[in-house]
């Protein structure tokens, strides 16, 4: 769980920030590639201004060159997190790419249930790039509903949910969602796993994940581009969906290798449905961009 919250509100009266030049954009494009592995084409120059100009206002910097120089100072390294928050994509949702959750129920969970019963095996899942938490909570609800309380209690199931963006992690930890956001959740699961949020200023439109589901998940902040991950365990199931699409080929291959290395034998890796065409050593491709470790 992130210990520090980041406020994007400018502390001074806003002033006009000059649009980035091509040279300035190239500086940030290289920085974003280095730090996050993201590819930003020249068409994203408008996006740099739209997402980052408030940070320049906050520090009373007028040009993107000024802000780039500011970021290069060792004493300002913490400012990089604000940049990460501004430039990362945070789209998420319950039952996004529903085929994956159908596959969990039909193919993966039955095998896991047998292992948990016969071998007393504990299950560890990872939502890599969890954004606002819907994916991780989705995994937890589906697992709880299929496997039952008895099997997942006492450490039978734990889920790691990670993201580089601290702003969305703060939101995920709260576990609060509007009725519109949870509309894809089947009614039977909505009634079972959501409750009215008592801290939402009597806003009946906000519901919270129940505590029995929340306690299954640990939210952690770290960068998937790090050379090593602060993870000691092996996972039986990893979701890393719609992340690879944004990465340059070299970083994409590195990330895939790390994910495979963190999979337990016979574990499953789930990628985004459009993230096809990757050849993973030691992995068998099943369907819907789902792989199993040999």
Where are these regions (language model features)?
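Conserved beta-strand signature within the Rossmann-like core of class I S-adenosyl-L-methionine
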Residues: 266-273
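A structural alpha-helix within SAM-dependent methyltransferase catalytic domains
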Residues: 105, 140-144, 260
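Conserved SAM-binding loop of SAM-dependent methyltransferases across substrates and taxa
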Residues: 132-151
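Extended basic-aromatic, gly/pro-enriched interface segments that bind polyanionic ligands
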Residues: 128, 152-235, 239, 243-247, ...
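Conserved class I S-adenosyl-L-methionine
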Residues: 120-133, 137, 158-160
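A short glycine-rich, Lys/Arg-flanked "PGG" loop and its adjoining helix->strand segment in the class I
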Residues: 253-265
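Conserved AdoMet
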Residues: 2-126, 272
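Class I S-adenosyl-L-methionine
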Residues: 275-294
